[in-house]
């Protein structure tokens, strides 16, 4: 999976948000706020990733357990999937 190029990460008054651009605006006209972990995952999704590779990246960066990292990745992806921001 990877991020949809028609969604961009922006800093709006100190808050990180993912916003649709181009034709994606017709499908999703809102924005999604991300914390630092979500922004890190978003950056990783510039390239093709798997749940396992994203989980491993969180374990390494934040020194957390694999179960916690996988739960964070799953929650992040469940938030993004309905918007079309992630291409599976």
Task: Give the residues covered by each predicted segment.
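Acidic, low-complexity/disordered tracts enriched in E/D and polar residues
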Residues: 1-39, 43-46
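Long, charge-rich, low-complexity alpha-helical segments
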Residues: 30-88
């Amino acid at each position: 999976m990877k991020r949809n190029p028609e969604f961009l990460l922006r800093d709006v008054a100190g808050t990180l948000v993912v916003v649709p651009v181009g034709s994606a605006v017709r499908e999703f006209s809102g924005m999604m706020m991300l914390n630092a972990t979500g922004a890190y995952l978003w950056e990783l999704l510039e390239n093709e990733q798997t749940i396992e590779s994203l989980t491993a990246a969180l374990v390494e960066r934040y020194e957390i357990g694999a179960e916690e990292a996988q739960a964070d990745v799953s929650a992040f992806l469940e938030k993004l999937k309905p918007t079309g921001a992630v291409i599976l």
